[in-house]
A protein has these predicted regions:
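N-proximal low-complexity "stem/linker" segments adjacent to membrane-targeting elements
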Residues: 1-32, 38-39
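Hydrophobic helical membrane-anchoring modules
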Residues: 1-9, 158-160, 184-243
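Donor nucleotide-sugar binding loop of glycosyltransferases
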Residues: 19-22, 50, 81, 107
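Acidic donor-diphosphate engagement hotspot in glycosyltransferases and nucleotidyltransferases
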Residues: 26, 54, 85, 109-111, ...
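Conserved donor nucleotide-binding strand/loop of the catalytic core
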Residues: 41-44, 55-91
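A conserved acidic beta->alpha catalytic loop
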Residues: 47-56, 104
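Acceptor/aglycone-binding surface of glycosyltransferases and processive sugar-polymer synthases
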Residues: 75-91, 96, 108-188, 214-233
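Short beta-strand-to-loop acidic/aromatic patch adjacent to the donor-nucleotide binding site
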Residues: 95-103
């Protein structure tokens, strides 16, 4: 029988790069989320050397919302999403860590869905899948979907997991487990690397839940491209076979 998990603080890591148009909006969405069981929110924003007004937008938001627990870290040079996550993971003090993009593609209201398997005592890690469940999904790029499913299937073959969405942003981790991993990938290779390494932890309990997805186009600011897909392919082999 599963034992209920006690959680005091959820660390929310937000890597940002040139998200001046949306960063204040995602922070407002997070602010409105009421977590169960009096869990506190620790928001960690890592600016990856933005060249727009992202930093000033963050600072302005913090001044008018000083009751929120927000920590900000700055990279002097652009290193990539993975590097920003490494910085955020090192700063996190909560028992659990969730990853949140600043682009409004993922809805913070669904933290409750991801948290439930943990709070019920069943899970150490929870992935939010865009390909399961009955929630809303914006209809976009066919080949992105094909590529995502291919990478997920290939990753599953090596990890012996049955994930439906390895590349999802929404990943919730036991902080001690995540911090124990020697993560190296500084860009979008973070997803296959962390999946490969977390799957190797003895007796780790990984769950998946369905989430909504409000994808954006490249004109709207989407950053991932075909080169990142090839890097993900390399990382699946590197961290599962070459090690």
């Amino acid at each position: 029988m599963a034992t209920k998990q006690k959680m005091n603080t959820l660390s929310i890591i937000i890597p940002v790069y040139n998200e001046g148009n949306t960063v204040h909006l995602i922070l407002e969405k997070i602010k409105k989320v009421v977590l169960p069981e009096n869990i506190e929110k620790e928001i960690i924003i890592v600016d990856d050397a933005s060249t727009d007004d992202t930093v000033s937008c963050i600072q302005a938001y913090c001044k008018t919302n000083d009751t929120l627990k927000i920590r900000i870290a700055y990279h002097k040079k652009n290193k990539g999403k993975g590097a920003a996550l490494h910085t955020g993971i090192a700063l996190a003090t909560g028992e659990y860590i969730i990853i949140q993009d600043a682009d409004l593609e993922y809805d913070p209201k669904e933290y409750l869905i991801l948290l439930q398997p943990v709070l019920d005592g069943f899970a150490d890690v929870v992935y939010g899948s865009r390909f399961m469940g009955g929630n809303a999904h914006r209809v976009l790029f066919f080949w992105h979907t094909v590529g995502n499913k291919f990478l997920t299937t290939l990753s599953n073959m090596f990890t012996n997991l049955n994930l439906t969405d390895m590349e999802t942003c929404y990943k919730l981790f036991d902080a001690k487990m995540l911090k124990s991993l020697n993560l190296k990938e500084e860009r979008f290779g973070f997803e296959p690397e962390v999946t490969a390494k977390i799957s190797k932890i003895p007796k780790v309990r990984i769950y998946e839940v369905g989430i909504s997805y409000y994808g954006r186009t490249y004109q709207e600011g989407k950053k991932i491209n075909w080169k990142d897909g090839f890097r993900a392919l390399f990382c699946i082999v590197r961290y599962n076979v070459l090690r």
